[in-house]
């Protein structure tokens, strides 16, 4: 947490020390709110074994960008989503407790120093978590686990217009994962554990407007650790070198605007972290729902 505080202190110093009221540009703001609901229901006399269900997902995506001075540009991206599935028993037709279907809390701040060179230095901070950890049903844990990533290096904008941007960056990164682990389900006791590692990070962001109704966004994150705080604990086990593998997080979204408030979105995500699973994890969501743009 001290490293997080130091990052923001340095960023604020650059922002306010180098900016001037004459030069400062206005904020570029974008906030989208969305709600998707799917519902099936059957009467008690219905035959065939079908059961009713209700699935809902609420989301909020926002981007705040500002040029504080001739050389300092700051961009904060936040993505929040949470959804549940309510299912009905096939025999009794009673509704079971809802289960979580979607959960995401992702905030990233990127500060670039535009020196009019081939590449621009940058500092970045990213916070990743979920609203509810439901891995142990007996013990509710909120905003768990927490992943903090601080990085710095060089970046380059390969393509940029008013509605399109392709930006890549490469740098050194430090990660800390703070986990509230359950030690006693009866007494509902937990303890806080944390691990840290450091290595090299590559992030590429793509934002393209394909037409007045279709847009595409993509984010590819690659991370290769050079050291791991728990390496001694896994030494001599089959998992000894798992932490050295490259972690992958690739997100893609195609969004189609049907009308002012109705939107269709296809989202898929590919994750690979050998410490969690030897196989890649894939998620795909096709949604039709309401979207409201605040800005």
Model-derived features: positions:
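Membrane-embedded beta-strand positions of outer-membrane beta-barrel proteins
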Residues: 31-33, 76, 123, 152, ...
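Transmembrane beta-strands of outer-membrane beta-barrel pores
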Residues: 35-41, 80-86, 127-133, 158, ...
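Surface-exposed strand-loop-strand hairpins of Gram-negative outer-membrane beta-barrel proteins
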Residues: 38-59, 88-98
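Extracellular loop and loop/strand-boundary signature of outer-membrane beta-barrel proteins
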Residues: 45-50, 92-97, 135-142, 186-192, ...
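Outer-membrane beta-barrel proteins
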Residues: 61-70, 108-117, 153-161, 204-212, ...
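Repeated loop/turn-to-beta-strand initiation elements of outer-membrane beta-barrel proteins
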Residues: 72-74, 118-121, 161-166, 212-216, ...
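Outer-membrane beta-barrel transmembrane domain signature
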Residues: 165-257
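Outer-membrane beta-barrel "beta-signal"
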Residues: 282-295
């Amino acid at each position: 947490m001290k490293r997080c505080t130091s990052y923001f202190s340095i960023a604020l110093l650059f922002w306010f020390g180098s900016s001037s009221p004459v030069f400062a540009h206005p904020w570029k703001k974008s906030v989208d709110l969305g709600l998707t609901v799917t519902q099936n229901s059957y009467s008690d006399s219905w035959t065939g074994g079908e059961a009713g269900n209700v699935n809902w997902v609420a989301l909020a995506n926002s981007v705040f960008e500002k040029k504080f001075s001739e050389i300092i540009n700051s961009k904060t991206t936040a993505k929040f989503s949470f959804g549940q599935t309510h299912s009905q028993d096939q025999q009794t037709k009673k509704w079971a407790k809802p289960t979580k279907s979607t959960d995401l809390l992702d905030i990233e701040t990127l500060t670039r120093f535009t020196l009019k060179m081939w590449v621009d230095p940058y500092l970045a901070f990213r916070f990743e978590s979920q609203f509810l950890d439901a891995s142990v049903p007996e013990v509710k844990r909120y905003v768990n686990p927490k992943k903090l990533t601080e990085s710095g290096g060089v970046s380059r904008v390969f393509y940029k217009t008013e509605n399109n941007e392709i930006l890549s960056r490469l740098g050194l990164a430090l990660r800390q994962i703070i986990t509230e682990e359950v030690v006693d389900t009866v007494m509902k006791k937990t303890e806080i554990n944390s691990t840290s590692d450091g290595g090299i990070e590559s992030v590429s962001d793509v934002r393209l407007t394909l037409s007045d109704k279709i847009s595409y966004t993509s984010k590819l994150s690659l991370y290769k650790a050079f050291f791991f705080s728990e390496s001694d604990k896994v030494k001599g086990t089959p998992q000894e070198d798992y932490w050295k593998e490259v972690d992958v997080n690739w997100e893609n979204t195609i969004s189609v605007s049907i009308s002012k408030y109705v939107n269709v979105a296809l989202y898929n995500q590919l994750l690979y972290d050998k410490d969690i699973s030897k196989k890649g994890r894939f998620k795909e969501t096709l949604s039709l729902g309401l979207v409201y743009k605040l800005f």
